[in-house]
């Protein structure tokens, strides 16, 4: 197969030109905030720092009240500005990208534009936490579908999940093996979930075969398989998902689950859209952050 390189490519860029870094290096740390205001990037810096370091944002607002604390604030600002103008950074509004073009010129350069399109991406750690809490709600489970994790494998007496990620919410970001004892019940569940099936239908099928087993034990077994990721629910975010919230909303709508949560998630999407379209500044972002928290952050289900 023959591949041809496209003339246009995407490149990560510093938020500010290299000339800013040179000027910062020649500036006393105690004067860095005055320099930021002088070149007219104070509003942008405030917004970017509000996203990446709320504590530093609060400290900037208090400049002039405590000289000792001011000096620590200036040092932090100095480091932020130096990094943002000398190398790419992976966080918040400092994580800028641009489009480049191949040319015959030997010298490369970055053309700075006056406009900046801002895009917001919801933290996946919050998304995973929301999904996990939904999957711990029996009323939700009773309405959604499950499917067997194809990455698992059998040994003589156990079923192994070689990649347990704790639904993406592990603080240590650790992945480990987990295993369960292979029984007739777990084998029946595995055989009947090779393709997606409603949780409630799976319960019904098991109860029809294992009439002497109480329903609570069957539910407990299935829920344990979900917890250990031997079973995936349809709430699991697929790879390369453009909008996790839209995906979760589609599952909630399809199965008529938690209309209050649906409403709040729609509000978040609307606030994000308005902020991006209006290219709002720090005050706009602060107002929306407060409304997001009131919507679902404090109580996602």
Language model segments and positions:
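Type-3 copper protein
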Residues: 1-121, 220-301
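Extended, well-ordered protein cores
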Residues: 68, 74-182
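Extracellular/oxidizing-compartment recognition motifs
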Residues: 164-179, 185, 224, 231, ...
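Short capping segments at the starts of secondary-structure elements
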Residues: 190-201, 211-213
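Short, positively charged loop/turn segments that connect secondary-structure elements
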Residues: 174, 207-219
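Elongated alpha-helical scaffolds
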Residues: 184, 198-204, 216, 220, ...
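Catalytic cores of nucleotide-enabled group-transfer and carboxylate-activating enzymes in metabolic
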Residues: 177, 181, 185-191, 204, ...
